[in-house]
Amino acid sequence: MYTPTASVLVGLAALKGASAWGTLGHATVAAKSVLSDTSTSYLANVASWADTYRSTAAGKFSAPYHFIDANDSPPSSCNVNYARDCTSSGCSISAISNYTQRVADARLSTASTAEALKFLVHLLGDVTQPLHDEALEVGGNDIKVTFDGYANDNLHSDWDTYIPEKKVGGDSLTDAQSWAKTLIASIDSGSYKSLASSWVAKSNINDAVTSATAWASDANALVCTVVMPNGVAALQTGDLYPTYYNKVIPTVELQIAKGGYRLADWLNKIYSANIAKRDLEGQSEELVSRMAMAAPLPPANRPNKAQLAREAYGGGCGCDKHKK
């Protein structure tokens, strides 16, 4: 499913000219080369690929990679515990770790490297969306709400798609690129300038599980403070537009800015370390081995209630179950 949010995130990482990115140029050029996509719709192609792939027979295995079901108790308590919340089928955190390793593995084919890169581009966006880091009501998919006059809606879809679309004014790639430029300006010289360095302060490609857990925890905390600070019932008493929308849209923009900035930084770290370069195969194998050892899957626990509910959605995030 194409969403402007995903393309904005990719746009943040791909647009040139923002000094806040430093050495971004070589990473994005290398990434685009690996993806073998020079079309004008490059951003949309990359942003939507993982969602499209999970809906295919070949890609069904990847459905759990788009979320981690934090078994917490919002709005009173929000927290992510990798060992508790990531199942043996995987989750966004384990997938980010795995595909970081694969992008870095010089032994893989160009096609396999491109696939890993496309997963990373998408999943670093998913992990910044608070409801992709929450188990309650299948990440908000089963929280029925009204948004902008549409009564047959759900909270997850609003955060994934309809709140961003309302802000952007549409769902075209041009809209997404325009929004990305605005957010880049905020990072480069505006309200995010003093914050941006903290978003990547602990990013470490050699310990991707810890990095991704920190990102998921950061977003999950917002479930308690922003997404549903007064509980589920408070969201179902009237239209979420405009009052709720006006309260949460600054956070939506902040999270998208974080995702794009982290993605750019993550790709830079991979490529500037020369991990993925084919002519450094020996060095790559050493680094890949170290990264793989640091990223085991959590133990196979018995499925809890939230995970069983997720299985009823076919194992996916449920994002495409409700469409206007």
Locations of regions flagged by a protein language model:
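Fungal secretory targeting signals
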Residues: M1-A20, K324
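N-terminal, motif-rich segments that launch catalysis or mediate targeting to/interaction with membranes
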Residues: K16-V121, P130-D239, T243, V248-A257, ...
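Glycine-rich, acidic and aromatic/proline-enriched surface loops and short helix-turn segments
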Residues: D126
